[in-house]
């Protein structure tokens, strides 16, 4: 039996998704929860191996097991810390969460202070469609041509929510796109320079660095014919935990904001 789990996690608590020795990772936390629950499994595959600091609202992992308890999200939620299982569905035996994905949706939360929001929006449109993203990724030997299906800039007041959807992404691609949009909004990078970079014409010394990982959220992984109904009790627990963290962080944010007014 193969079961796909839709999971959320606070990426600031982990050294990335993929299991590594001597550090806390999302994959390691899930495996520990499976073992502590007494659930035997053969393999665990993920849709996205997010970097250190990157959070998720809808990453997907597939687990092969004969233990029916895995279909109840609360079994693992009772053992997990900083990770939440929101949904569990049975899938075909050949399902692979990465290769079966139709698209992934990422959202970046960028502080909008001093930014020309209209310039950010204008620059964002340049990334739509098929381009060479070698200037906007950490090159690891893979083909650098990718296609962005959708990019939106939502003005939320103190922050911009920049949402990007594509079938596949390169390493650090979203974070480098966001940094480029920020530089455009600050007037430090022109639209023409961005166009040249998207044609693969750039000096390595001028390559745009990535925006901080902590602002990035993997919102959703989409599949054809596979839905993830959210478990009521799992959602209740997740919201309660998130609201507690939000209250703590917003109090600290306002404290820092007040200190800037001296």
Curated annotation (Swiss-Prot):
Query: What Gene Ontology molecular function terms does this protein carry?
Result: RNA binding; tRNA pseudouridine(38-40) synthase activity
Name the Gene3D superfamilies on file. Pseudouridine synthase I, catalytic domain, C-terminal subdomain (3.30.70.660), Pseudouridine synthase I, catalytic domain, N-terminal subdomain (3.30.70.580)
Binding-site residues, substrate: 106
User: Which example biological process does GO assign this protein?
Assistant: tRNA pseudouridine synthesis
EC numbers: 5.4.99.12
Q: Name one Pfam family in it.
A: PseudoU_synth_1
Catalytic residues (UniProt): 51
- Disulfide bridges in this chain: none
Keyword annotations from UniProtKB, A to Z: Isomerase, tRNA processing
UniProt xrefs under SUPFAM superfamilies: Pseudouridine synthase
| Catalytic activity from the UniProt record | uridine(38/39/40) in tRNA = pseudouridine(38/39/40) in tRNA
Q: Which InterPro entries match?
A: PsdUridine_synth_cat_dom_sf (IPR020103), PsdUridine_synth_TruA (IPR001406), PsdUridine_synth_TruA_a/b_dom (IPR020097), PsdUridine_synth_TruA_C (IPR020095), TruA/RsuA/RluB/E/F_N (IPR020094)
Isomerase as a keyword of this entry, yes or no, is yes
Write down the PANTHER family for this protein, in alphabetical order. Answer: PSEUDOURIDYLATE SYNTHASE, TRNA PSEUDOURIDINE SYNTHASE-LIKE 1
What job does the chain carry out? Formation of pseudouridine at positions 38, 39 and 40 in the anticodon stem and loop of transfer RNAs.
Q: Which family does it belong to?
A: Belongs to the tRNA pseudouridine synthase TruA family.
Protein name listed in UniProt: tRNA pseudouridine synthase A
């Amino acid at each position: 039996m193969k079961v796909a789990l839709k999971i959320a996690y606070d990426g600031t608590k982990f050294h990335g998704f993929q299991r590594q020795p001597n550090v806390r990772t999302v994959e390691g936390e899930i495996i520990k929860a499976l073992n502590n629950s007494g659930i035997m499994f053969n393999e665990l595959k993920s849709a996205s191996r997010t970097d250190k600091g990157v959070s998720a609202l809808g990453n997907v992992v597939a687990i092969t097991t004969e233990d029916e308890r895995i279909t109840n999200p609360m079994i693992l939620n009772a053992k997990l810390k900083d990770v939440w299982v929101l949904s569990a569905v049975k899938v075909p035996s050949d399902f692979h969460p990465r290769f079966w994905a139709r698209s992934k949706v990422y959202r970046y939360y960028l502080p909008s202070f001093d930014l020309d929001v209209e310039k950010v929006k204008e620059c964002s449109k340049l990334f739509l469609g098929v381009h060479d993203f070698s200037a906007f990724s950490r090159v690891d030997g893979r083909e650098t041509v990718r296609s962005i299906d959708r990019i939106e800039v939502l003005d939320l007041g103190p922050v911009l929510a920049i949402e990007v959807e594509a079938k596949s992404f390169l390493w650090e691609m979203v974070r480098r796109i966001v940094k480029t949009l920020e530089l455009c909004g600050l007037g430090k990078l022109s639209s023409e320079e961005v166009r040249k970079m998207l044609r693969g014409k750039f000096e390595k010394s001028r390559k745009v660095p990535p925006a901080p990982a902590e602002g990035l959220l993997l919102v959703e992984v989409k599949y054809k014919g596979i839905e993830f109904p959210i478990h009521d009790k799992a959602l209740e627990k997740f919201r309660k935990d998130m609201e507690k963290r939000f209250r703590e962080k917003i109090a600290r944010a306002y404290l820092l904001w007040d200190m800037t007014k001296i």
